[in-house]
Amino acid sequence: MKQEASEQARKGQAGSLLERLRFAGLDEDACALLRDHRQALSPRIELALRALSHRLQASPDAARHFDSDRQIDRLHDLQSSHWNVLTDARFDGLYAERVKVLADTESRMGLDPRWQIASHAIVLEHLILGAIEDAWPKSILSLGKARRRELRDLVAALVRAAFVDTEIAVSLRFNALRQQHQRQLSEQRRDDESELKTLFADFLRALGEGDLTARLPEDAPDTYQPIVAGLNTALGQIRDALLAADKRATAAEAIVSDLRGSAAEFSGNAGAEAKAIDQHLVSLGTVTERIRTGSIRIGETEAQASRTRIAVERSGEIAGQAISAMADIEASAEKIGQIIGVIDEIAFQTNLLALNAGIEAARAGESGRGFAVVAQEVRALAQRSGEAAREIKQLVTGTKGQVVAGVEIVGRTQHAISSIAEQVVSINEAVTGIAREAECQVNDLASATSEIGGVAQAMNRSAALAGAALASTDDLHGVIVELGETIRRFHLDRQARSAASFAPRMRIEAPEDETTSPFGEVTSERHLAGWRR
């Protein structure tokens, strides 16, 4: 379908071009003549385009359309290509393409058609003058040169005058068409605005009053049918959405009320629990401190028990040393007894010897009396030595018995000390175990205190969050209530107005069980109940 339309447009353009060529008298012979002189015309065209570029740069009115010299060079290249195709005089698709490219480029640059006419005038002037120059017979006479110069000036003046007149006429016509087009656009705009006001005024007034049952008439002009249908559909969807939002807002209001109660209760409970946990945390800290103090004292007791164990062990060692010393004393007493026995035997033998000496002295008579006295003294000394030996033996025997009793007592003491040492070791081990358990309990209580402190902080944060949630639910409740009131300000009842027969200016009588709101719409008891809520 598009290809057919494009083909028809192309044929129409070709027919229009042929008609223009026919009207201008450009038949095949004229086109062939142009092609024959194409090589001679090309240098003249290039000179003319250079002159055109200089004039465009020198003219302030023309130069303001160009941002840089590169745009002028670009225009020069396009015009050179255009004149190259034009002097080929075939007027085919390539020519149409070149014409369109040049026209689009000049349009983008903001050049009016007057500049196109002026550029053609300059090129045509150079071409005509060049043709006259080439065709004029060479003459050495000054009269011929003067006539040639006069003819050139005349032709140039005629070309300039004709194209200036054409440019002015085209500019005036173009301005007139543009003004006419602007007037037509203004009139069309006023007509459209008037039609839009007629079509939308009552509709917009009803919407401003909050009546969402208002609809645009279905017999609107075809131009506005898509807008009318779209607006009516959109309003229907908005009405349905607001009705659903009204129901959901009512349900949300009830839910938020429940949430407010739950949040308030949770906030109170969380605060009370946080205070209770803080109190328990203080008590637990006191208990932990007491257990830590007890643990320190248990450690001191453990050290004291260790010192006691060492002292008892030393006492056992001393008792052992005492037993060893008493054993040595007993051995010495035994030896002393033996020595005393020897002394007693010596005293007995000495007594016998003294007795025998006395007997012998008595037998000797007077000569042995001195010896008898000595013997008597020796006997007395022997008796005293024997008595002393017996006394010492009795003392040594008593001492030996006492030493044996002391050894037995010291042995029992050593056994008791050993038992005490074992008990002290057991007590020390028990105290060490108690100290370790106390230290573990202190660490466990410290961990429990830290965890309970974390729980207390969490409860405090929960209480704060609950308070914030309560405040948020209060705000949300207020927002939902305001949303419900805002929704209920709109007129959403379809029975009050008919979408098909919308008459914005017609006054609607409210039933007896309905009330007219300050917005001018009919408000049902259900809406009033929502407002009361």
UniProtKB/Swiss-Prot annotation:
GO molecular function: heme binding; oxygen binding; transmembrane signaling receptor activity
Region of interest (Disordered), ranges: 501-533
Domain Methyl-accepting transducer residues, every copy: 248-477
Feature: compositional bias, Basic and acidic residues: 523-533
Pfam families: MCPsignal, Protoglobin
A cellular component annotation (GO) from this entry: membrane
PROSITE patterns: CHEMOTAXIS_TRANSDUC_2
Keyword check for Chloroplast: no
Family, per entry: Belongs to the methyl-accepting chemotaxis (MCP) protein family.
Name of this chain's protein: Probable chemoreceptor McpE
Source organism phylogeny: Bacteria, Pseudomonadati, Pseudomonadota, Alphaproteobacteria, Hyphomicrobiales
